[in-house]
């Protein structure tokens, strides 16, 4: 009976250790995914900012061509 108890405790202990290792790997994967999302957000923010500047510049040029500049000319 003592042999069975020791075996059962050993199996349970090894199971808990493997679960702990799997949880750590899962957390690391989630952290990596979060970092990727932050990088994507950073890139999209840069693209969005450049697009806004490009549109503002283009609208200014169009206004100059049409004669709607702000200087009153």
From Swiss-Prot:
GO biological process: defense response to bacterium; symbiont-mediated hemolysis of host erythrocyte
Main location group: secreted
Keyword terms of this UniProt record: Amphibian defense peptide, Antibiotic, Antimicrobial, Cleavage on pair of basic residues, Secreted, Signal
Superkingdom of the source species: Eukaryota
UniProt signal peptide: 1-22
Family that this chain belongs to: Belongs to the frog skin active peptide (FSAP) family. Ocellatin subfamily.
Record-given protein name: Ocellatin-PT7
Species: Leptodactylus pustulatus (Ceara white-lipped frog)
Record lineage: Eukaryota, Metazoa, Chordata, Craniata, Vertebrata
């Amino acid at each position: 009976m003592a042999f069975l108890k020791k075996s059962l405790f050993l199996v349970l202990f090894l199971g808990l250790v493997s679960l702990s290792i799997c949880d750590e790997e899962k957390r690391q994967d989630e952290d990596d995914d979060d970092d990727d999302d932050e990088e994507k957000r950073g890139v999209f923010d840069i693209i969005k900012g450049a697009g806004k500047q490009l549109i503002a510049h283009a609208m200014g040029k169009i206004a100059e061509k049409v004669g709607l500049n702000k200087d009153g000319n």
